[in-house]
Swiss-Prot record:
The gene is minE. NCBIfam families: minE, PRK00296.1, PRK13989.1. InterPro entries: MinE, MinE_sf. HAMAP family: MinE. Prevents the cell division inhibition by proteins MinC and MinD at internal division sites while permitting inhibition at polar sites. This ensures cell division at the proper site by restricting the formation of a division septum at the midpoint of the long axis of the cell. This is Cell division topological specificity factor. Keywords: Cell cycle, Cell division. It comes from Verminephrobacter eiseniae (strain EF01-2). The lineage of its organism: Bacteria, Pseudomonadati, Pseudomonadota, Betaproteobacteria, Burkholderiales. GO terms for biological process: cell division; regulation of division septum assembly. Pfam families: MinE (PF03776).
Length: 88
């Protein structure tokens, strides 16, 4: 009965699980080779990361970079965030 009510009322997903699902989709697209040198989603991913991090720490959006690097069969998604001195 509880699962039926959850289905009807809609159960909210946690932010972490949503982010995990998004990253899995992004990685799946990358592995299929659908995107060229730099994927179209990187700017959107960067904007979303700035929005989420800004909820907890005030950062300059220019101090967050997202970079995808490919080496042979390895893909590395690198995210660099420069935190203000008051947080460190």
């Amino acid at each position: 009965m509880a699962s039926f009510l959850s289905f009807l009322l809609g159960e909210k997903k946690k932010t972490a699980s949503i982010a995990k699902e998004r990253l899995q989709i992004i990685l799946a697209h990358e592995r299929n080779g659908r995107n060229a040198c730099e994927p179209d989603y990187l700017p959107a991913l960067q904007r979303e990361l700035v929005a989420v991090i800004s909820k907890y720490v005030k950062i300059n959006p220019e101090h967050l970079t997202v970079h995808l690097e490919r080496q042979d069969d390895l893909e590395v998604l690198e995210v660099k965030i420069e935190l203000p001195d008051s947080v460190r």
